[in-house]
C-alpha cells in the first residue's frame, strides 16, 4: 500500500529498502522492526514533498527453504507462495506499511535479470571455476571461516557451531564458480575512507573495515549440491548462490536491464536497512558486485541491532519469535509502530518487555499526548462551542511555545530524515508535547474562563488557539510514525477543510505558526489511546 501525498516529479527517488526476508517461517518482531523503520523513514521523506520509493520483499531460494518445504511435504515454490500470501503481505498491510513494491526472488522479472548480471560478470572475467571445502551454515546460507566458529556444548559437544544460529555447521566440498572478491579489498577500503557514513552505525563500520583489512577471499557464487535456485546460465548443473541472487533484488526491482528510465530515476538505494547479522553481505559483497559491473553504490548501509528476548536474539530458528499481532491486538497498530522506534536506539540491541511497553504507552501516549488532545478539544467545545477562537493576546508564554515548536521540527527533521535517529526524533516531538502540557497547566484556562472581561476572553482564546495550533503541528510530525491516530487528531482539529490532506503537509514547514485558521470546527473524537486492558494470559 503506497501512502498518499504530493511529490516532486522528475528528481531521483529517495530509495529505501529493507532486506528481503527468508520465507522459511512467518515474520516476527525483528522483521517488523526493520520494516516499520523503513516505512517511517520513507513516509517522512514523502512528507518533505520528495519522490520516494520503498522496497521490501521475500528471499525464496536456497537450501534452508528447500529443507523447510520438504519437512512440510510441499514444493519450495508452494511453501513460498503460502507464506507470502498468508503471513508476510498480510502483516505489512496490518502494520500500515506503505511499500511501493514487494519483490519475490522467484519472480521472472528478478530471475532473468540475475542471470544476465552474472553472465555479464562471467563474460568480463570476474567469475572463474574452482573447488572449495569448508564449514557451511545452512541457516546463514554461507561458508564460515574456522576462526568464527564456536565450540559446541551439551548435545553439540565436539562439534563446531555457527556463531549466529548456534547450530552445527556442515563440512561441504563442491566444485563452484567464484567471484574475484579478493581483488576489491583496496577499492572497498578507499570507498569506506572517502564515504565515512557509508556504513552505520560507527561500530558496524569499524567491523566491516577491520574485516576487509584482513584480506578478502574470492566468493563462491554457485552451488551444485542442491537445485532450488536460479540456474547458472552457462552451466545448468549449478544454481546461483542465494546471497548473490538476493542482493540483486535491489537492482532488479527498479528496472535493471529492463526499464532504463525507472532504473536511472531510482537506483542506487539511498538507504539499505539491514540487520547486523547480514551486514557483511551488504557492505562488502554488494558494493563489490556493483563495482565489478560499473554501477553506482548505495548511499548508506544502516545496520539495526537485534531485538533480544531472555538475552538471546529474537529469531525464527531459536523459536524466541513473538508475533507482532500479539502486541497490536493489545496496544494497537500505531502504538506498536511508535514503541520499538521510541524505546530502542536504532543501530543498538534492545530488549522487549510487555511491562515496558505498557508503562510507556500509559505515560507517554495516553497521559501526555492523548490526554492533551482530549483536553484541548473539550475546552474549545465547552468555552467556544467547538469553534476555534482567534489568538489576540500573545505574550512571552506563547512565544516560548512558538520557539519550542521551531526547535522540535528542526530536530525531528534532522534526526529522522537524515540521521536515522528515530528515537531522537520522536523524543524531540514528545518533549514539545510535554512543553504544551506544561503551558496549559501554567496558564490554567479553566480559571481564566471565569473572567468575563474582554481581556479574560481574549486570554482564554489565545491559550486554546495556541494549544490547538501546537497539536496541528504534532499531528503533522507524528503522521509518518502513527498515521491512524494522527489522522484522527487532524479530523478532530477540523484542519482538512482549510489546510488539505494530512499527508500533503510538509514536515519541515510544521513550525510555520498560524496555519490552523480561527473558525475551524474542533470536535472531541474518540480517545486516541484508550486505557489498556489487563495483559492477556500467556
From Swiss-Prot:
CDD domains per the UniProt record, alphabetical: Anticodon_Ia_Met, MetRS_core
Known catalytic reactions: tRNA(Met) + L-methionine + ATP = L-methionyl-tRNA(Met) + AMP + diphosphate
Cellular compartment(s): Cytoplasm
Motif 'KMSKS' region, residue range(s) on this chain: 313-317
Keyword Signal assigned: no
EC identifiers of the protein: 6.1.1.10
Record's keyword annotation contains ATP-binding: yes
One Pfam family matching this protein: Anticodon_3
Keywords recorded for this protein, A-Z: Aminoacyl-tRNA synthetase, ATP-binding, Cytoplasm, Ligase, Metal-binding, Nucleotide-binding, Protein biosynthesis, Zinc
BP GO annotations: methionyl-tRNA aminoacylation
Residues binding Zn(2+), per UniProt: 137, 140, 162, 165
Entry note: cofactor: Binds 1 zinc ion per subunit.
Motif 'HIGH' region mapped to chain: 21-31
Cofactor: Zn(2+)
Alphabetized GO MF terms: ATP binding; metal ion binding; methionine-tRNA ligase activity
Quaternary state and interactors: Monomer.
Protein name: Methionine--tRNA ligase
Organism: Streptomyces coelicolor (strain ATCC BAA-471 / A3(2) / M145)
Gene: metG
Amino acid at each position: 500500500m503506497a501512502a498518499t501525498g504530493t511529490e516532486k516529479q522528475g528528481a531521483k527517488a529517495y530509495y529505501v529498502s529493507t532486506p528481503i526476508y527468508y520465507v522459511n517461517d512467518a515474520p516476527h518482531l525483528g522483521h517488523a522492526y526493520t520494516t516499520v523503520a523503513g516505512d517511517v523513514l520513507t513516509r517522512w521523506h514523502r512528507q518533505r514533498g520528495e519522490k520516494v520509493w520503498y522496497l521490501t520483499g521475500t528471499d525464496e531460494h536456497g537450501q534452508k527453504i528447500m529443507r523447510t518445504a520438504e519437512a512440510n511435504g510441499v514444493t519450495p515454490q508452494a511453501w513460498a507462495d503460502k507464506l507470502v500470501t498468508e503471513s508476510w503481505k498480510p502483516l505489512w498491510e496490518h502494520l500500515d506499511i506503505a511499500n511501493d513494491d514487494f519483490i519475490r526472488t522467484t519472480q521472472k522479472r528478478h530471475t532473468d535479470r540475475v542471470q544476465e548480471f552474472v553472465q555479464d560478470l562471467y563474460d568480463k572475467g570476474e567469475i572463474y571455476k574452482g573447488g572449495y571445502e569448508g564449514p557451511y551454515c545452512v541457516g546463514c546460507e554461507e561458508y564460515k571461516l574456522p576462526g568464527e566458529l564456536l565450540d559446541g556444548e551439551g548435545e553439540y559437544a565436539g562439534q563446531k557451531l555457527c556463531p549466529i544460529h548456534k547450530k552445527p555447521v556442515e563440512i561441504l566440498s563442491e566444485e563452484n564458480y567464484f567471484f574475484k572478491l579478493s581483488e576489491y579489498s583496496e577499492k572497498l577500503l578507499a570507498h569506506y575512507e572517502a564515504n565515512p557514513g557509508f556504513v552505520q552505525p560507527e561500530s558496524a563500520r569499524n567491523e566491516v573495515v577491520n574485516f576487509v583489512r584482513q584480506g578478502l577471499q574470492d566468493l563462491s557464487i554457485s552451488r551444485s549440491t542442491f537445485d532450488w535456485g536460479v540456474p547458472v546460465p552457462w552451466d545448468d548443473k549449478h544454481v546461483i548462490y542465494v546471497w548473490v541472487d538476493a542482493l540483486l533484488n535491489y537492482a532488479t526491482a527498479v528496472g535493471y536491464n529492463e526499464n532504463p528510465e525507472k532504473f536511472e530515476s531510482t537506483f542506487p538505494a539511498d538507504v539499505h536497512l539491514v540487520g547486523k547479522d547480514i551486514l557483511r553481505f551488504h557492505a562488502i559483497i554488494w558494493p563489490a558486485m556493483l563495482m565489478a559491473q560499473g554501477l553506482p553504490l548505495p548511499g548508506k548501509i544502516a545496520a539495526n541491532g537485534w531485538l533480544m528476548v531472555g538475552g538471546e536474539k529474537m529469531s525464527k530458528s531459536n523459536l524466541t519469535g513473538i508475533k507482532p499481532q500479539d502486541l497490536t491486538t493489545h496496544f494497537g497498530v500505531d502504538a506498536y509502530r511508535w514503541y520499538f522506534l521510541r524505546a530502542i536506539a536504532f543501530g543498538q540491541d534492545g530488549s522487549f518487555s510487555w511491562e515496558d511497553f505498557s508503562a510507556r504507552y500509559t505515560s507517554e501516549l495516553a497521559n501526555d499526548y492523548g490526554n492533551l488532545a482530549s483536553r484541548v478539544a473539550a475546552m474549545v467545545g465547552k468555552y467556544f462551542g467547538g469553534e476555534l477562537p482567534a489568538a489576540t493576546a500573545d505574550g512571552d508564554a506563547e512565544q516560548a511555545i512558538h520557539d519550542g515548536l521551531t526547535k522540535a521540527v528542526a530536530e525531528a527533521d534532522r534526526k529522522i530524515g537524515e540521521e536515522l535517529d528515530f528515537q531522537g526524533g520522536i523524543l524531540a516531538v514528545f518533549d514539545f508535547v510535554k512543553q504544551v502540557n506544561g503551558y496549559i497547566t501554567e496558564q490554567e484556562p479553566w480559571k481564566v474562563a471565569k473572567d468575563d472581561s474582554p481581556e479574560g476572553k481574549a486570554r482564554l482564546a489565545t491559550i486554546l488557539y495556541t494549544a490547538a495550533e501546537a497539536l496541528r503541528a504534532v499531528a503533522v510530525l507524528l503522521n509518518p510514525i502513527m498515521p491512524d491516530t494522527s489522522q484522527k487528531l487532524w479530523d478532530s482539529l477540523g484542519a482538512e477543510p482549510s489546510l488539505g490532506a494530512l499527508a500533503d503537509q510538509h514536515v519541515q514547514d510544521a513550525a510555520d505558526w498560524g496555519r490552523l485558521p480561527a473558525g475551524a470546527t474542533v470536535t472531541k473524537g474518540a480517545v486516541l489511546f484508550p486505557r489498556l486492558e489487563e495483559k492477556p494470559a500467556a
